[in-house]
C-alpha cells in the first residue's frame, strides 16, 4: 500500500483596492436612476434583498413598469437634473446610476458622493464608491466575486464555476445551523468548544443530512458531538467517471474535497486526483484486472479500519462503482461491519467512451438493446459468458476488460454465427486526451489491437452501431 501527502501551494495575495462587505438593505431606500435593461438587472437584485426602490427615469422597461404597477417600486420622477437629485438623495442607503448615459451617471455619482451616500455608476468604477459583485446565492448564504470592476465578464464566469461547486442544500445547512446555535451555546458556553463541535459537524454526515433536509438525522449526529463521543467515520463509494475530469458529477467533486483519505486504483487519472482535498491522504490500492496492490478483502478491511477510526474515506473508482467495479462486494463488507456509507454513481465507461468516440450504443435501425459483459477470464482461462445472448444481431455488446482476451471473444462470437465482417470498435483511454479509436470486424480486430499495441483501459464495442460512428469535423 502506497500513501502520499497531498500538498498545496499558497496563492499569492492580490489587492484589488475594494473592500468586500455585506450591507443590510431590508426596508432601506435605494435610488435607482435609470429605467432600462441595466436598471432591471440591478432592480431584481435589490428587490431580492428587500430594498425599497425609488426609480428616477423618463422611460420604464416593461419589467420596471410592472414593479411600479404592483407597488414594489416607486416611480419618483423622470429627469435626473441636479435639483431633483438633491431632493431625492437625502435618506437613501445606496444609489445606483444605471442610465445609458455615462455623463448622467457621473453627474449622479458626483452629487451622491458630495452627500456621503454610497453610489455605484454601473460599469464605471472610476466615480463609484462601491460596486456590486457577481453573486451566488444558496438561501441565506451569499458568495460574492469581484474583480474591482476590471473584468466583469471574468467575475461572472467565476460565479458560474462557483455555482457548480456549491451544493444546492447549502442554504438549508445554514438555516439548520442558525436554528441550533442557541441550543449548542446553552450546552457549551465556551466559544472554542462550540467552534470545535460545529467544525466536526460540518466534517461529518450530519452536515449532509441537513443539506438534504433530514433534520432528525442531523440532530442525531449533532447530539453525538454534544455528548462528547468520538467522531464516527464514513465511507463514500464514488464513481469518478471514465477519465475526463469535466465528466465528474458535482456530488462526487463535493465529497472529493471533503475526504480525509482516498483509496484509488489505476483507472483514476492524475487529473482527477488533483481535484481531491489537498491535505487528504492518497492511498493507492492498484486494482487492475488480475494485478492488485491489495487483494479485495484487504481493501475492504482498510476501508472499515479507517472509517471506524473516524475518517471520512473516499473509495474512488473509475466509471461507475456498480458496473464491473466490485462496488457491491465493498458495500456488503461495510454493511457487515456496521460502517455508514454513501453511494455516488459516475458516468460509466460505456457511456463516456461511446460518446467521445461518436458511436451510439443504441440505434433505431439496428440496435434495440445494449448488453454489458466483462471479458475477464476465470483462473483457468475460460470465458464464462452468455454467448447465445451476445450473438443477438439486434443489439450492441459492450465488453469491459476485454483486450487480453480479444482473440477468444472474437472466436466465440464467430462460433455463435456472427459473420466475419461484423463491426467491432476499440476505444482506448476513452474520454482522455490520448484517446485512440480503432474500428474493424470480428475477423480483423484482434490483429489490429496487437499491431497497435492497445493497452487497458480499453472498451470493446460490438455491433452494427459501429458503422454509424460520427466524428465532428
Curated annotation (Swiss-Prot):
- Record's Pfam families? CysG_dimeriser, NAD_binding_7, Sirohm_synth_M, TP_methylase
User: Any idea which UniProt keywords this protein has?
Assistant: Cobalamin biosynthesis, Lyase, Methyltransferase, Multifunctional enzyme, NAD, Oxidoreductase, Porphyrin biosynthesis, S-adenosyl-L-methionine, Transferase
Which reaction equation describes what this protein catalyses? uroporphyrinogen III + 2 S-adenosyl-L-methionine = precorrin-2 + 2 S-adenosyl-L-homocysteine + H(+); precorrin-2 + NAD(+) = sirohydrochlorin + NADH + 2 H(+); siroheme + 2 H(+) = sirohydrochlorin + Fe(2+)
Give the source's domain of life in one word.
Bacteria
| Ranges for region Precorrin-2 dehydrogenase /sirohydrochlorin ferrochelatase | 1-222
Give the residues the record marks as binding S-adenosyl-L-methionine.
242, 318-320, 323, 348-349, 401, 430
Q: Can you tell me which residues form the catalytic site?
A: 265 (proton acceptor), 287 (proton donor)
Q: What is its EC number?
A: 2.1.1.107, 1.3.1.76, 4.99.1.4
Q: Which InterPro entries match?
A: 4pyrrol_Mease, 4pyrrol_Methylase_sf, 4pyrrole_Mease_sub1, 4pyrrole_Mease_sub2, CobA/CysG_C, NAD(P)-bd_dom_sf, Siro_Cobalamin_biosynth, Sirohaem_synt_dimer_dom_sf
In the UniProt record, does the keyword Signal occur? no
**GO molecular function list:** NAD binding; precorrin-2 dehydrogenase activity; sirohydrochlorin ferrochelatase activity; uroporphyrin-III C-methyltransferase activity
Output the GO biological process annotations, alphabetical, semicolon-separated: cobalamin biosynthetic process; methylation; siroheme biosynthetic process
Q: Which residues bind NAD(+)?
A: 37-38, 58-59
Pathway recorded for this protein: Cofactor biosynthesis; adenosylcobalamin biosynthesis; precorrin-2 from uroporphyrinogen III: step 1/1; Cofactor biosynthesis; adenosylcobalamin biosynthesis; sirohydrochlorin from precorrin-2: step 1/1; Porphyrin-containing compound metabolism; siroheme biosynthesis; precorrin-2 from uroporphyrinogen III: step 1/1; Porphyrin-containing compound metabolism; siroheme biosynthesis; siroheme from sirohydrochlorin: step 1/1
Q: Where is this region: Uroporphyrinogen-III C-methyltransferase?
A: 233-473
Q: What is the role of the protein in this entry?
A: Then it catalyzes the NAD-dependent ring dehydrogenation of precorrin-2 to yield sirohydrochlorin. Finally, it catalyzes the ferrochelation of sirohydrochlorin to yield siroheme.
Family assignment?
A: In the N-terminal section; belongs to the precorrin-2 dehydrogenase / sirohydrochlorin ferrochelatase family.
Matching entries from NCBIfam families are given as: cobA_cysG_Cterm, cysG_Nterm, PRK06136.1, PRK10637.1
What is this protein called in UniProt? Siroheme synthase
Biological source species: Gluconobacter oxydans (strain 621H)
Amino acid at each position: 500500500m502506497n500513501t502520499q501527502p497531498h500538498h498545496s501551494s499558497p496563492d499569492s495575495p492580490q489587492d484589488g483596492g475594494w473592500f468586500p462587505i455585506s450591507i443590510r438593505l431590508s426596508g432601506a431606500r435605494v435610488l435607482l436612476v435609470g429605467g432600462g435593461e441595466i436598471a432591471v438587472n440591478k432592480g431584481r437584485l435589490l428587490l431580492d434583498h428587500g430594498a425599497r426602490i425609488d426609480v428616477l427615469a423618463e422611460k420604464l422597461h416593461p419589467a420596471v413598469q410592472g414593479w411600479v404597477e404592483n407597488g414594489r417600486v416607486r416611480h419618483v420622477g423622470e429627469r435626473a437634473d441636479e435639483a431633483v437629485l438633491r431632493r431625492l438623495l437625502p435618506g437613501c442607503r445606496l444609489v445606483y446610476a444605471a442610465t445609458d448615459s455615462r455623463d448622467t451617471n457621473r453627474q449622479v455619482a458626483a452629487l451622491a458622493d458630495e452627500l456621503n451616500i454610497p453610489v455605484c455608476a454601473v460599469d464605471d468604477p472610476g466615480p463609484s464608491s462601491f460596486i456590486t459583485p457577481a453573486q451566488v446565492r444558496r438561501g441565506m448564504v451569499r458568495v460574492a466575486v469581484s474583480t474591482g470592476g476590471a473584468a466583469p465578464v471574468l467575475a461572472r464566469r467565476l460565479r458560474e464555476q462557483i455555482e457548480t461547486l456549491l451544493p444546492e442544500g447549502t442554504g438549508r445547512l445554514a438555516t439548520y445551523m442558525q436554528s441550533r446555535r442557541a441550543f449548542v451555546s446553552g450546552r457549551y458556553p465556551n466559544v472554542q468548544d462550540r467552534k470545535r463541535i460545529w467544525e466536526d459537524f460540518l466534517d461529518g454526515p450530519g452536515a449532509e443530512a441537513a443539506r438534504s433536509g433530514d433534520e432528525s438525522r442531523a440532530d442525531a449526529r449533532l447530539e453525538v458531538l454534544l455528548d462528547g463521543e468520538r467522531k464516527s467515520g464514513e465511507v463514500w463509494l464514488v464513481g469518478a467517471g471514465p477519465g475526463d475530469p469535466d465528466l465528474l458529477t458535482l456530488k462526487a467533486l463535493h465529497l472529493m474535497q471533503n475526504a480525509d483519505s482516498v483509496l484509488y486504483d489505476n483507472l483514476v487519472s492524475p487529473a482527477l486526483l488533483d481535484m481531491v482535498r489537498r491535505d487528504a491522504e492518497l492511498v493507492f490500492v492498484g486494482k487492475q484486472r488480475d494485478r492488485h496492490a491489495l487483494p479485495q478483502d484487504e481493501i475492504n478491511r482498510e476501508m472499515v479500519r479507517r472509517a471506524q477510526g473516524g475518517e471520512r474515506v473516499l473509495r474512488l473508482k473509475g466509471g461507475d462503482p456498480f458496473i464491473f467495479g466490485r462496488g457491491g462486494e465493498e458495500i456488503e463488507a461495510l454493511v457487515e461491519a456496521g460502517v455508514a456509507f454513501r453511494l455516488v454513481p459516475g458516468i460509466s465507461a460505456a457511456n463516456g467512451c461511446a460518446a467521445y468516440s461518436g458511436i451510439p450504443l443504441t440505434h433505431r435501425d439496428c440496435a434495440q438493446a445494449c448488453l454489458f459483459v466483462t471479458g475477464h477470464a476465470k483462473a483457468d482461462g475460460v470465458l464464462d459468458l452468455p454467448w447465445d445472448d451476445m450473438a443477438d444481431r439486434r443489439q450492441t455488446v459492450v465488453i469491459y476488460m476485454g483486450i487480453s482476451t480479444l482473440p477468444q471473444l472474437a472466436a466465440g462470437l464467430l462460433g455463435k454465427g456472427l459473420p466475419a465482417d461484423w463491426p467491432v470498435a476499440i476505444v482506448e483511454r476513452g474520454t482522455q486526451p490520448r484517446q485512440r479509436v480503432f474500428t474493424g470486424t470480428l475477423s480483423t480486430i484482434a490483429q489490429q489491437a496487437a499491431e497497435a499495441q492497445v493497452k487497458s483501459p480499453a472498451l470493446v464495442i460490438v455491433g452494427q452501431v459501429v458503422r454509424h460512428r460520427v466524428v465532428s469535423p
